[in-house]
UniProtKB/Swiss-Prot annotation:
Pfam families noted in UniProt: IF-2B
Gene: drdI
Provenance organism: Bacillus cereus (strain ZK / E33L)
Keyword rRNA-binding in record: no
Name this protein carries in UniProt: 5-deoxyribose 1-phosphate isomerase
Family membership noted in the UniProt record: Belongs to the EIF-2B alpha/beta/delta subunits family. DrdI subfamily.
Record key words, sorted: Carbohydrate metabolism, Isomerase
Active site feature: 239 (proton donor)
Pathway assigned to this chain's UniProt record: Carbohydrate degradation
Enzyme category, top tier: isomerase
InterPro entries: Deoxyribose1P_isomerase_DrdI (IPR043679), IF-2B-related (IPR000649), IF-M1Pi (IPR005251), IF_2B-like_C (IPR042529), Initiation_fac_2B_a/b/d (IPR011559), M1Pi_N (IPR027363), NagB/RpiA_transferase-like (IPR037171)
Residues the record marks as site: Transition state stabilizer: 159
Listed GO MF terms: S-methyl-5-thioribose-1-phosphate isomerase activity
Residues annotated for substrate binding in this entry: 48-50, 91, 198, 249-250
Annotated catalysed reactions: 5-deoxy-alpha-D-ribose 1-phosphate = 5-deoxy-D-ribulose 1-phosphate
Length: 346
């Protein structure tokens, strides 16, 4: 077992991120000292995964205001709001981003009696608390998910909802790590996840380093693997869950859910409660980020299609709640009717 890769660290008053765009070929950590640097890291996906984005943005708020020298507390609070609004533009789909920024802004608006120096300290402590909470949430999700698994089963996952997408354990991968700790042998199938290949470059990498049995398959092999009886369950992460249980996750998740339903394979979604957005009624209202065409036709510096090709590149799709067997949160396992049962978590 190799040393675990740590995606997010706070060191020497700076945010240290593992540059995930370079994996699996290079392991490079980069320090960020400004909100602008954090914004760019989120946008170009040096850090990715809804929980990790939220934690990074929280630190980004502190970095954006730590050098503030204006004279009044009111001006400082306005600057906190400005930095939060700026960081919110980095990526539109992951609700954890907005949840974390709302928490950071509330620190300022709810403590107007504090001095600027005290507010800065409170902002940093809140960012660290969001960081700590995420690690505990991941373990709790894993413990609940493990009750649905058994030794020797085959599990398919899509994209990376692992330790690299969070702060430790991951969400969808948390039961895989805990199963390893129990001495279980799970057989993991990881979709490569076109076009950015997070399943092969990230999920396979971190599971291999942890000594977990993982096999990489292309996205269009999932049906074959399921038809051969090799998959007993599917578990994925998510970037947002609507109030009715519709799930926004990495592009391709919808197709996996349809296949799982056809082959009568349970389809589980690992979802920290901050990703559950009761203000969004259904998946139709979730904004879907579209990314650059180069990710599809020029991924490795060489064109795989005519340069002038029209390209449609949504980063996420929405899986309807009818395809979801259960949503696994740190507070427990939620099953249909989701509209009613998700509310009970709050």
């Amino acid at each position: 077992m190799k040393e675990q890769l740590i995606p997010i660290q706070w060191k020497d008053d700076a945010l240290v991120l593992l540059d995930q765009t370079l994996l699996p070929n290079e392991v490079v950590y980069e320090s960020f000292n400004t909100a602008e640097g954090v914004w760019d890291a989120i946008q170009v996906m040096k850090v990715r995964g809804a929980p990790a984005i939220g934690v990074s943005a929280a630190y980004g708020v502190y970095l954006g205001v730590k050098e503030f020298v204006e004279s009044t507390e009111a001006e400082f609070i306005d600057e906190v709001k400005r930095v939060c609004a700026y960081l919110a533009t980095s990526r539109p789909t992951a609700v954890n981003l907005f949840w974390a920024l709302e928490r950071m802004e509330s620190v300022a608006t709810d403590h107007t009696h504090l001095s600027i120096a005290q507010l800065k300290d409170r902002l940093l402590e809140e960012a660290k608390e969001i960081h700590r909470e995420d690690e505990e949430i991941n373990r709790q999700i894993g413990e609940h998910a493990l009750t649905l698994f058994h030794d020797g089963m085959g599990v398919l996952t899509h994209c990376n909802a692992g330790a690299l997408a969070t702060t430790k354990y991951g969400t969808a991968t948390a039961p895989m790590y805990l199963a390893k700790e129990k001495g279980w042998d799970l057989k993991i199938y990881s979709d490569e996840t076109r076009p950015r290949l997070q399943g092969s470059t990230l999920t396979a990498l971190e599971l291999q380093r942890a000594g977990i049995d993982v096999t990489v398959i292309t996205d269009n092999m999932a049906a074959m693997v399921m038809s051969q009886g090799k998959v007993d369950a599917v578990i994925v992460g998510c970037d947002r869950v609507a109030a009715n249980g519709d799930v926004a996750n990495k592009i391709g998740t919808l197709g996996v859910s349809i296949l799982a339903k056809y082959y009568n394979i349970p389809f589980y979604v690992a979802a920290p409660t901050p990703t559950i957005d009761l203000k969004t009624p259904t998946g139709k209202e979730i904004p879907i980020e579209e990314r650059d065409a180069s990710e599809v036709i020029n991924r490795f510096g060489q064109y795989s299609a005519p340069k002038e090709s029209k390209v449609y590149n949504p980063a996420f799709d929405v899986t309807p709640h009818e395809n979801v067997t259960a949503i696994i949160t740190e507070k427990g396992i939620v099953k249909a009717p989701f509209t009613e049962n998700l509310k009970k978590l709050f």
